[in-house]
């Protein structure tokens, strides 16, 4: 029997892969921010609903996205700005670990503020 969820998952994965293949670095970073903030909302729901297995999966995804954002930094060319962004990504990673261990949404909220501000700044770079 055909599982429609498998088809949708394959479509969604192909769609993201196709967007990533045709995107420039600016768009790729924006996609990472979008994915991060979407997944952060899921973590909030998982903690509120006490779905701790799903929370762990979402935290793992968030950590991978932070790794991707950090890997996109050019610390040599970016200088102090890139170093500051790296520090913020690492701070968010630590906050996510605390949120996961303590099931404390205040860590999620502070991470959301930081990442939303970074996303807005990155979006502003694209309009210049």
Residue ranges: model-predicted function:
Residues 1-32, 37-42, 47-49, 53-63, ...:
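N-terminal intrinsically disordered, cationic/polar leader segments
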